């Protein structure tokens, strides 16, 4: 068991034994390789099942808002920011929340690993320091962590949690080191027609399962616009206008709020690079308005602030 | 062509090309971490090394969006409907896994029940689509077909079953259509009848591979002992009322990944879309994970939280469908939902929890149940 997992268990068991929380939201081992499962531990014995691996790729803030009671949540940098978000948006009271801060070395991308295995079945993955060892029935291959990290983790700007009631490890270097503005160059150098073509192509394989929406900790509407039936705002078909409208509106709902946690991209069964849209919003908020979402409980959300000298580029 | 034929593996592209005369031939193609059926292109070749396609092939017979009819709301044609022409092209899917073929056979029983309720769209596509299966020699960690009335070399739903023997491929006809197809293959390449010493060896190799594949599942911590037996003995109400459901649903995101990647999920929603003076009636996949799925016009929703919705999915697979289909589970064990669920809710664990809880549940009520879906 790794040091992070051991420490998470210690903290969770103590919090539960001392009855400081009703439940601890974290991960336990997945049933298959390259997976970890969200898990709600309610007793010290259950807390013994908690773990931490590079495959904790969901965003637990998503589940935290609906569980009720006093809750401790294991949170990396991005998840801690989304916890700030749900507190700010009155979906969870700060006094009911205990953040178990997990300094993050970046989560792993199971798809990148599968791609590198070219058809050979993976039976296990070991993480040691900067090395990731992938094993199969008759092979073992070692990769640098950076080679198989998720894209959003490579360019992460805040790996240390912004809230920390309990701490799992010493802080790690604050950023992932990659250039977060690289992805949006994809859009910026293109003419409108080419942008639209890229937009269309990006979401061509969407099956409208809404895993991206449901994995996202930002979504908070009681009834999502895609589920509105009277009037029905959006068609149900696989036709391009229906699919693209969904993705466009979903992305806009994340403007100024997206922490680039990558949960949407990890959840997508079709392997769609979801962040192509949301990273543009993140970048606009950061570069045009100097705003990074949910860095502190006091900061005002980007869309709640108006200044006469706000830039207009965002409309172009 | 009644008997199985052995072909060189190198001849498979030639056979596929021959089958492509007058038909669109689709094969599994892997790009990155995704595998999907794509039109066969001899220049790109094909690989027999893939686990299974990321999505099930059900959309070939049951498209996610399908126009059923068109209508006018104004003018002299107002109120008249025109059915959409049934224009299914002739197709051949090569490399369908036995679990997915079993799902087609199962869905036949949903869409083609009797003369009065046959779904013409499904039936025509099924009739015009030939299925050449590829036996599983190396099941994935998530596979459990052997626990779901299936097997890695099963032939249900297929026209031909192909078995990869390394340098050779064994093609076994299953249906009359498959026998005709095998005759076409024998014209395109040299096939050796699987009889005599050589045939016996090939059949023996196939058998060894089948047993090897079954052994993989038998060694899985999730498959042995997986059974619907206790669930089948309990009434619908008992299974419905088990205490296990809130905990199973707790981490569910209520997205539709499990239902949309499932080869047997077949629920749909029919909508009329009107623009100006005309419109169309269109059928789209729907998912029981969605709040909207059971929302009534009155505002009432009989499945108001994810607990009821999650329960519905597993009840449908393991209780309602067996009740409707003479005991056959509504799941074929392909493992896609296990692989794809963002929360890693594992249907094998859910069935085991249902099984254990059913064993210790108090006796069922004496009121007989009626199967519903």
Segments (PLM) and residue ranges:
Chain B
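Iron-sulfur-associated redox domains of electron-transfer enzymes in respiratory
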Residues: 1-236
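Active-site-flanking alpha-helical
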Residues: 104, 263-267, 342
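Ferredoxin-type iron-sulfur electron-transfer modules in oxidoreductases and energy-metabolism complexes
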Residues: 225-250, 268-373
């Amino acid at each position: 068991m790794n040091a992070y997992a051991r420490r998470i268990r210690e903290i969770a068991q103590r919090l539960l034994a001392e009855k400081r929380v009703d439940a601890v939201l974290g991960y336990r081992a997945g049933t298959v390789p390259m997976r970890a499962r969200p898990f709600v531990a309610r007793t010290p014995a259950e807390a013994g099942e908690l773990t931490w691996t590079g495959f904790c790729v969901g965003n637990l803030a998503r589940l935290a808002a609906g569980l009720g009671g006093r809750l401790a949540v294991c949170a990396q940098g991005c998840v801690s920011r989304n916890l700030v978000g749900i507190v700010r948006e009155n979906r969870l009271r700060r006094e009911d929340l205990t953040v178990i801060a997990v300094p993050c070395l970046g989560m792993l991308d199971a798809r990148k690993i599968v791609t590198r295995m070219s058809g050979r079945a993976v039976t296990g993955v070991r993480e040691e320091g900067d090395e990731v060892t992938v094993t199969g029935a008759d092979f073992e291959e070692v990769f640098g962590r950076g080679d198989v990290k998720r894209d959003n983790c490579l360019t992460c700007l805040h790996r240390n949690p912004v809230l920390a009631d309990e701490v799992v490890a010493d802080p790690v270097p604050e950023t992932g080191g990659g250039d977060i503005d690289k992805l949006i160059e994809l859009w910026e150098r293109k003419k409108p027609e080419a942008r639209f073509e890229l937009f269309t192509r990006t979401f061509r394989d969407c099956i409208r399962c809404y895993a991206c929406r449901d994995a996202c900790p930002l979504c908070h509407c009681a009834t999502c616009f895609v589920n509105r039936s009277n009037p029905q705002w959006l068609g149900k078909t696989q036709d391009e206008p229906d699919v693209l409208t969904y993705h466009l509106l979903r992305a806009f709902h994340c403007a100024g709020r997206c922490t680039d946690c990558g949960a949407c991209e990890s959840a997508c069964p079709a392997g769609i690079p979801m962040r192509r849209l949301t990273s543009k919003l993140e970048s606009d908020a950061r570069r045009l308005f100097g705003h990074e979402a949910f860095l502190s409980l006091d900061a005002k959300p980007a869309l709640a602030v108006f200044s006469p000298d706000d830039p207009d580029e965002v409309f172009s | 062509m009644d008997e199985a034929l052995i072909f060189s593996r190198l001849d498979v592209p030639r056979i596929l090309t021959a089958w492509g005369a007058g038909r669109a031939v689709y094969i599994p193609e892997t790009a990155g971490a995704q595998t999907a059926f794509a039109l066969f292109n001899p220049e790109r070749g094909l690989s027999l090394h893939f686990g299974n396609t990321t999505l099930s092939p059900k959309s070939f017979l049951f498209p996610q969006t399908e126009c059923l009819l068109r209508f006018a709301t104004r003018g002299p044609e107002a109120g008249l409907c025109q059915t959409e022409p049934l224009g299914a092209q002739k197709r051949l899917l090569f490399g369908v896994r036995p679990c997915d073929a079993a799902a087609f056979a199962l869905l036949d029983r949903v869409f083609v029940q009797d003369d009065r309720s046959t779904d013409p769209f499904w039936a025509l596509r099924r009739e015009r689509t030939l299925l050449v299966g590829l036996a599983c020699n190396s099941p994935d960690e998530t596979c459990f077909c052997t626990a779901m009335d299936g097997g890695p070399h099963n032939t249900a739903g297929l026209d031909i079953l192909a078995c990869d023997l390394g340098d050779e491929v064994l093609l076994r006809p299953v249906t009359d259509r498959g026998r005709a197809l095998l005759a076409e293959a024998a014209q395109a390449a040299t096939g050796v009848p699987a009889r005599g010493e050589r045939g016996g060896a090939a059949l023996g190799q196939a058998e060894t591979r089948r047993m090897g594949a079954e052994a993989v599942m038998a060694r899985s911590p999730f498959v042995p002992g997986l059974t619907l037996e206790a669930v089948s003995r309990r009434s619908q109400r008992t299974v419905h009322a088990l205490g296990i459901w809130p905990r199973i649903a707790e981490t569910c995101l209520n997205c539709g990944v499990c239902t949309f990647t499932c080869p047997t999920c077949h629920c749909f929603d029919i909508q009329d879309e009107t623009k100006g003076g005309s419109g169309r009636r269109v059928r789209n996949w729907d998912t029981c994970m969605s709040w909207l799925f059971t929302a009534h016009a009155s505002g009432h929703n009989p499945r108001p939280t994810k607990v009821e919705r999650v329960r519905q999915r597993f009840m449908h697979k393991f209780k309602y469908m067996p009740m409707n289909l003479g005991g056959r589970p509504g799941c074929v064990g392909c493992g896609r939902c296990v692989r794809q669920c963002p929360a890693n809710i594992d249907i094998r664990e859910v069935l085991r929890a249902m099984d254990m809880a059913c064993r210790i549940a108090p006796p069922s009520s004496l009121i007989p149940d009626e199967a519903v879906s």
